[in-house]
């Protein structure tokens, strides 16, 4: 009966499925200059699969549907972890907005000036294109 459970040192592919796959906990971390709640997972149980001891963060601040208690209560398999990583990365990528600084007004004026110049250049380009088209086709 002692040989029924093989330790990780002898067999690399062995995973004890009775124990939870990973520990997860919440931590306040600095992300892109702002402090946010981050779900941190420690992959010590599946070290043989991933070959890493790194702490892998998921940024959940952008998602309103996943609350702390609901997310930490869930049990995830490896594939679902990867899916969730990708999902929240996409959420952050599309919905992350930088804070606007209202103190500096000179930059906004500069931006407006550059925009005007760009539109003028675009107008000139369109005019040139029309001329080229008329020369080529007529």
UniProtKB/Swiss-Prot annotation:
The keyword Plastid applies. One of its GO terms (cellular component) is chloroplast. Its main location: plastid. Keywords: Chloroplast, Plastid. It is found in: Plastid, Chloroplast. This is Uncharacterized 16.5 kDa protein in psaC-atpA intergenic region. It comes from Chlorella vulgaris.
């Amino acid at each position: 009966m002692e040989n029924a459970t093989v330790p990780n040192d002898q067999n690399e592919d062995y995973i004890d499925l009775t124990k939870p796959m990973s520990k997860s906990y919440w931590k306040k971390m600095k992300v892109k200059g702002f402090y946010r709640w981050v779900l941190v997972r420690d992959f010590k149980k599946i070290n043989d699969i991933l070959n890493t001891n790194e702490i892998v963060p998921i940024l959940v601040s952008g998602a309103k549907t996943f609350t702390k208690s609901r997310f930490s209560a869930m049990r995830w398999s490896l594939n679902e972890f990867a899916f969730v990583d990708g999902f929240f990365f996409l959420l952050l990528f599309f919905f992350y907005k930088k804070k606007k600084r209202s103190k500096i007004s000179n930059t906004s004026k500069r931006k407006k000036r550059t925009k005007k110049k760009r539109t003028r250049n675009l107008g000139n380009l369109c005019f040139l294109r029309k001329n080229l088209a008329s020369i080529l086709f007529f």
